[in-house]
Amino acid sequence: MNFTPVREALTSLSRSNAGVASAVLLSMAASIALWMVFPDIDDENHLLEWLQALFLALACTVHGMRAWQEPDRQSLRFLMHAGLSALLFGFLLRELDIDQFGTAPAWAQLEKALRVVELLILIRVLIFFAPRARKVFSLAPQIFSMRITILTAIGGLLMIAGWPFDKKVFHGMPDAYALLGEEVFELGAYLLLFLASLSDTTAAARISLAPNRKAA
């Protein structure tokens, strides 16, 4: 099966502000509309959580593949994609609740093993980042002006927007509405993180993070 047209369409969508905003808002509105007909879709391990996991998995995979395919491992683009892939892998494990997939002990062991893998990946990314930290921080204005950073940051804000619903900050709000609010904001956030992973990062590829070598 040829997925090239789908990939090209998604990439084109990710480059359009109106397209990205429409996709995120439509997904959130559709979730609410579906919930009104099927009120169980926001329960644990139901439709909304599976869609969230799907978008997270796609975002993590795209970032990971782009980092793997980056020819210059000293470029800012490599660090951005590798770091975001590692971060989203952690979010994915948090979202999946693998130990709840079944009663067999193997599920709990699998989740623990994946947590160890996540930790090792994060340590490896931090080891790579440490000698380049000063250079990265000096590039902050450029980094935060990049589309991938802006979309990822907005995705993070949508995740934060769901937090008050999760913690039931709004007193008097029915639990059903609070749960729906949390899941809807997270769905929009994870879709946005996926679209952000498709952003053009050519500018980041031109920036080298190679540590300065001391003169002999």
Where are the regions a protein language model picked out?
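Membrane-proximal helix-loop-helix units in multi-pass membrane proteins
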Residues: 85, 89-144
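Non-cytosolic membrane-interface motifs at loop->transmembrane helix junctions
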Residues: 41-51, 102-114, 173-185
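Membrane-interface helix-boundary motifs at transmembrane edges
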Residues: 10-11, 65-79, 134-146
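Hydrophobic cores of alpha-helical transmembrane segments in multi-pass inner/ER membrane proteins
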Residues: 22-26, 52-65, 115-131, 186-201
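Short, hydrophobic transmembrane alpha-helix segments
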Residues: 35-47, 66-72
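C-terminal ends of transmembrane alpha-helices
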Residues: 29-37, 91-102, 156-173
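Membrane-interfacial loop-to-transmembrane alpha-helix junctions, especially the N-terminal start
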Residues: 13-24, 73-86, 146-153
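C-terminal transmembrane-bundle signature of multipass membrane proteins
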Residues: 160-173, 181-214
